[in-house]
């Protein structure tokens, strides 16, 4: 089966979020299952540098000007790059300028991505033509609309990684996008008078997926649907909405082989994990104390991630004898609050603003608990990394967090299924109660080790998702 993934990021060459991790791992897992998989992306500078050897497939005239499609390989996967320097050759983020303002021509930049994917489905590359086109998030949403406009030359799947980002643009641009005028309606890509690239993907795809079973249910409700819940309810009734859990790339995230760690370890050698803890405490200026559990945050610092709750719960966490490590960036108010906490609680709170992939590995390996108290979380990867590294996740019961972490309630400890700590209400007091339960388990090292080992043996590899996606493609 020939599959084309349409997206805007690819780990490790270009990453702004979890989408890049998915595209860096899922195609390879599908290839291992026998699929013929390729990816199409805009030729952003980081991607051009990372894939320097490419050949010209075709040059064509488009609504965005003359465009070259180039082809190369990265880690065994075929990669198409859309070479349009006027649109894509910009330093920094693929979505916004240095002042964090979205590029004014994003409507054109990402429409071209969908257009070129559709052209491949129509035979642009005479040597390869996809049977299934799999578009990811709003950046690729118009892919499904272009395929529908061209008579559906390939089957289409659209994956929602985060429904909150909808790709909304002025209806004035419709004439520039070479889409049928009749597509701009409620039963189409119109959303409150604007063009929604996300809705285009949802409405015109043959099948819609999202990145966990629970999130697939949640987004059919007003609290999580961002105005799309009616359409998503209809898709669910038609059997066209599926949740498939993301996985962990074990080539990158595995404490047995992770070269970014001071000391590698596994479930049978957890003493070596303590060495990583000492290194982390030293690096973050924390008191060296093996008996103090380290709670870690590796995240965008936003209210959506529930990190305001962490600040509210911090006094209790410290009073109980814990330490806090934070790596991330985002909301300026939250950044300042965490930095102030580090200054006030020197030796017990360490904060690093920014994101460093290598250091994120060291934090997850060196910590005892990874905090993911999100208000909503489509899937979440951080808690999966925590499980893999024996760093017990403390999460809110939402989205993929609900699907992957089993609370250390007595009955779950008794039957051996417990893998972390879960709270329900989106309130600081609920988080505090979960933190207290973590300390209770911490005070019983034998039970803590038992939960750690169980968590580390859970299988959240990408092969499971790859098989599920390929099975879905065959049913279309």
From Swiss-Prot:
GO terms for cellular component: cytosol. One of its GO terms (biological process) is glycogen biosynthetic process. It is an enzyme of class 2 (transferase). Gene3D superfamilies: Glycogen Phosphorylase B (3.40.50.2000). It comes from the Bacteria. ADP-alpha-D-glucose binds at residue 15. InterPro entries: Glyco_trans_1, GS/SS, Starch_synth_cat_dom. Its EC number is 2.4.1.21. Keywords: Glycogen biosynthesis, Glycosyltransferase, Transferase. It catalyses: [(1->4)-alpha-D-glucosyl](n) + ADP-alpha-D-glucose = [(1->4)-alpha-D-glucosyl](n+1) + ADP + H(+). It holds the Pfam family Glyco_transf_5. Synthesizes alpha-1,4-glucan chains using ADP-glucose. NCBIfam families: glgA, PRK00654.1-2. This is Glycogen synthase. It comes from Yersinia pestis.
């Amino acid at each position: 089966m020939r599959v084309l993934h349409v997206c805007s990021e690819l780990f490790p060459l270009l990453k702004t979020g979890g989408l890049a991790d998915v595209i860096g791992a899922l195609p390879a897992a599908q290839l291992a299952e026998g699929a013929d998989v390729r990816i199409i992306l805009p030729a952003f500078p980081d991607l051009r540098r990372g894939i320097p050897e490419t050949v010209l497939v075709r040059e064509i005239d488009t609504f965005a000007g003359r465009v070259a499609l180039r082809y190369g390989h990265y880690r065994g996967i075929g990669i198409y790059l859309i070479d349009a320097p006027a649109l894509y050759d910009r330093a920094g983020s693929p979505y916004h300028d240095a002042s964090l303002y979205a590029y004014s021509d994003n409507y054109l930049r990402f429409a071209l991505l969908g257009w070129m994917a559709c052209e491949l489905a129509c035979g642009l590359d005479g040597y390869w033509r996809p049977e299934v086109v799999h578009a990811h998030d709003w950046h690729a949403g118009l892919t499904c609309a272009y395929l529908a406009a061209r008579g559906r030359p390939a089957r289409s799947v659209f994956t929602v990684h985060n429904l909150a980002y909808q790709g909304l643009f002025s209806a004035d641009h419709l004439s520039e996008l070479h889409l049928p005028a009749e597509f701009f309606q409620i039963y189409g890509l119109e959303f409150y008078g604007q063009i929604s690239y996300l809705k285009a993907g949802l409405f015109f795809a043959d099948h819609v997926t999202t990145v966990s079973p629970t999130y697939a249910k949640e987004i059919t409700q007003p609290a999580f649907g961002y105005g799309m819940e009616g359409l998503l309810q209809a898709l669910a009734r038609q059997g066209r909405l599926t949740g498939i859990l993301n996985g962990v790339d074990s080539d990158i995230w595995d404490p047995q082989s992770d070269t970014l760690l001071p000391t590698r370890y596994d479930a049978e050698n957890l003493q070596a994990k303590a060495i990583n803890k000492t290194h982390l405490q030293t690096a973050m200026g924390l008191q060296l104390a093996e008996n103090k559990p380290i709670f870690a945050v590796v995240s965008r610092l936003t209210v959506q991630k529930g990190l305001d709750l962490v600040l509210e719960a911090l006094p209790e966490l410290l009073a109980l004898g814990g330490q806090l490590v934070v790596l991330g960036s985002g909301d300026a108010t939250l950044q300042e609050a965490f930095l102030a906490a580090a200054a006030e609680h020197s030796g017990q709170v360490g904060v690093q603003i920014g994101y460093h992939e290598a250091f994120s590995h060291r934090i997850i390996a060196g910590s005892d608990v990874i905090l993911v108290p999100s208000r909503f979380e489509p899937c979440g990867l951080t808690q999966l990394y925590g499980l893999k590294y024996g760093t017990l996740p403390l999460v809110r019961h939402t989205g993929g967090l609900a699907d992957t972490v089993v609370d250390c309630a007595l009955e779950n400890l008794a039957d051996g299924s417990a893998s972390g700590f879960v709270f329900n209400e989106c309130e600081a007091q609920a988080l505090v109660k979960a933190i207290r339960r973590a300390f209770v388990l911490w005070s019983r090292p034998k039970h803590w080790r038992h939960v750690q080992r169980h968590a580390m043996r859970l299988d959240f590899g990408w092969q499971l998702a790859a098989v599920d996606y390929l099975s879905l493609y065959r049913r279309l």
